[in-house]
Amino acid sequence: MENKIVASTKEEFNTWYKQFAEKHKLNNKYTESASFCAEIPQLDTYKYKMELASTDNERDAIYSSALIEATRFCAPIMECAWASCTGTVKRGLEWFDKNKDSDTVKVWDANYQKLRTETPPAEALLAYQKAALNWRKDVGFSIGEYTSILKKAVAAEYKVPGTVINNIKEMLSDMIRRRNRIINGGSDDAPKRGPVGREHLDWCREFASGKFLNAFNPPWGEINKAGKSGYPLLATGLAKLVELEGKDVMDKAKASIAQLEGWVKENKDQVDQDKAEDLLKGVRESYKTALALAKLSNAFRAQGAQIDTVFSSYYWPWKAGVTPVTFPSVSQFLFELGKNPKGQKKMQKALINTPLKWGKRLIELFADNDFTENRIYMHPCVLTSGRMSELGISFGAVPVTSPDDAAQGSGHTKAVLNYKTKTEVGNPCACIISSLFEIQKAGYDIESMDIVASEHLLHQSLVGKRSPFQNAYLIKGNATNINII
């Protein structure tokens, strides 16, 4: 087996792709990037089958079949082929050899076994994101809009057809419920963080930007005053700023607090020491609380947006010992996986039965039965049977040993993001996601699930991802605040 997508540079790849696209008459009628999609798949049959299913195995098989039907022909072929061409494979795998001992990789790679079972520390999440951005830059992965690092703010509106608007709004409401449940300590009945007012937010922004003396006279009175939720108002304001403006807010706030401490020390003759110490203690505690709230909120807001699909997809094979020589066998396995639905057990059996060592090594990376926390917290470097779909879209939509076979179709979940969101063509992305949600509702208790796969896809569409190969870590704003119209 050998990789037939031979291209070391963007120019060489463009030559290969132009011939391939013309030969297969790829189109972008319903998809952002050109694909084999000629029509929008209808999934009603799977909903009816789900209503009649009596076992979890049946339900899992039906949903897997629906996913493959929904995504079989909609993969972004150009980006999939670029992710799998000889040059990208060589550079993508070699990067981990060169950087495995760097600060941005070692903190999570060396602790992989721990991350399979435990909630990751914040530094392991941040290091992963920095590593993903570095990988993209060093490998030269970006060749256009659909392989880019997104930096814009979340849109204010998301337009959908009237036929699915109720479903999409229901999904968004459930996402908000889950976010609140996480933020409020796992209880739907716990006090909720209310909306943060503009005056409150503006004051916290000024405080974080260096106006530390504002701490003596906040608009709500005492600096350490708590809101209805029980959290200090300074903490909720800073946490909200992190949602809106990014994690740099906390670094700025930390510096402002240090300046405040220095000022109090230098002017000790001018302040009441007991009151000053109480104020400083409260500000420090508010900072710690804001960090915790921001982490909890981000865990929901970024459950998938912060999984860099192609970066993790290169990490797992590298970890399993895959080389450019054995890579074609991985691509072929994933292509077949996307043609025939397999549940968790059948997939693992197929990996175990492969004569190639990487199959068993991938199984050893799985965390399906080991992670006991809410799966929304699982580190994006950890592999599960569900995350095999990340590998699938990266390397399985276009089998490198026979790229022409891509015309047969191979369905992988994240390909949904390639469907257009434009209302001129009926927002097929939202329509497919809505259908998948209806299928899940027909067979599962949605409220009891840690992660609802269809909601996860909607979340990524709402934050602006129009391709599985985009990185959304730097996007500002909260997708759950978007207005569905």
From Swiss-Prot:
Q: EC top class, in one word?
A: hydrolase
Quote the cellular component terms of the Gene Ontology held in the record: helical viral capsid; ribonucleoprotein complex; viral nucleocapsid
- Pfam families cross-referenced by the UniProt entry: Nairo_nucleo (PF02477)
Q: Which GO terms describe its molecular function?
A: hydrolase activity; RNA binding
Task: Please describe, based on the UniProt annotation, the reported consequence of changing D272E.
Answer: Complete loss of cleavage by host CASP3/caspase 3. No effect on virus repliication in mammlian or tick cells
Q: What is its EC number?
A: 3.1.-.-
Q: How does it assemble?
A: Probable homooligomer; forms a double superhelical polymer. Monomer.
> Protein name, please?
Nucleoprotein
What organism, scientifically named, is this protein from?
A: Hazara virus (isolate JC280)
